[in-house]
Each structure stands twice: as structure tokens, then as C-alpha cells.
Regions:
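Cysteine-based protein phosphatase catalytic domain of the PTP/DSP
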Residues: 2-86, 107-139
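C-terminal domain-closing interface element
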Residues: 143-152
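Short, amphipathic alpha-helical segments that act as regulatory/interfacial helices
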Residues: 103-106, 142
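A phosphate-binding catalytic loop at a beta-strand-loop-alpha-helix junction
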Residues: 84-103
Length: 152
């Protein structure tokens, strides 16, 4: 498992194996968000298991990440973070889909979408939040999130 701490409560990286769960637990991770279509998360065998959210997506410009999945992930992550837990977002390489999810979590925490993308790129060299098919999903999520957060 290769990962980076983006903020004190958000990590982005590669797919964790079952033997990585103790390390995640030691870091305070209470939620793992799996963005991989091709690989379902392995259950945590610990008596107090880490929660998993499987949001299968495809890493392809032909299949944009659905906003409903980004919203679901951000909402679930915010519940965990507000309760004092930490979140680990991943895809296969921690480059696109997991990065998009991480950026959306940061937006939900109040970051400007471009600041969120820059922070992730700064903390995880392989991350590519500015990819031509990833950036627009993050920006669109930010607009939608802000519109839903405005008082009516």
C-alpha cells in the first residue's frame, strides 16, 4: 500500500490489502472509500472493522465519474471526519479516481476546488487531479455542493 497524508484526516493512495488494515487502524482511519470498479474491497476481519464504501467507477475519459458517487463519498466521509475519524480514499494507483474523491472531500470541508487539487498534487506526486477528464468532475462537484449548501 502506497499512500500520502493530504490533511490530518484524509489519506489518498493505492488499494490496501487485508494486512494493511492494522496500519490504517493505527492511523485512525475509520472509513476506506474504494473507487475501483474492478476490485471489491476485502472485508476487515478485525472485531471492530473499518467501514468501507465501494463506489465503483472506471478510470476513463469515456465514463466520467458520476457526481452522485462523489456526493455519496463526500457525505459519508464528512460524517466520519466530524465524529473524529479519518478517511482513506483509493483507486488502483491513487492517481485519478481516488484523487477525485479526495478533492471532493476537501471541497466538502470548505476548500476551493483548485486549492484542493493543488494541495493533493503537492502532497502526492503521482496524483493528477488536473487531468482533462478528472478536473471537470471536481469542479462540477464543487458547484453542485456549494449550491446544495446555500441557504434557501
Amino acid at each position: 500500500m502506497n499512500f500520502n497524508a493530504i490533511t490530518p484526516d484524509l489519506f489518498i493512495g493505492t488499494t490496501p490489502a487485508v494486512n494493511d488494515y492494522p496500519r490504517l487502524r493505527d492511523l485512525g482511519v475509520r472509513l476506506v472509500i474504494n473507487m475501483r470498479w474492478e476490485r471489491r474491497p476485502a472485508p476487515d476481519p478485525h472485531r471492530d472493522p473499518i467501514s468501507f464504501l465501494w463506489l465503483p467507477t472506471v478510470d476513463s475519459p469515456l465514463f466520467p465519474i458520476p457526481l452522485r458517487k462523489l456526493t455519496n463519498g463526500a457525505r459519508t466521509a464528512m460524517e466520519i471526519i466530524r465524529s473524529g475519524g479519518k478517511v482513506y480514499a483509493h483507486c488502483a494507483e491513487g492517481r485519478h479516481r481516488g484523487v477525485a474523491m479526495g478533492a471532493c472531500i476537501l471541497v466538502a470541508q470548505g476548500y476551493d476546488p483548485f486549492e484542493a487539487m493543488a494541495l493533493i498534487k503537492d502532497r502526492r506526486a503521482i496524483a493528477d487531479p488536473f487531468a482533462f477528464y478528472i478536473r471537470p468532475r471536481i469542479v462540477k462537484f464543487a458547484r453542485q455542493w456549494e449550491a446544495q449548501s446555500l441557504p434557501s
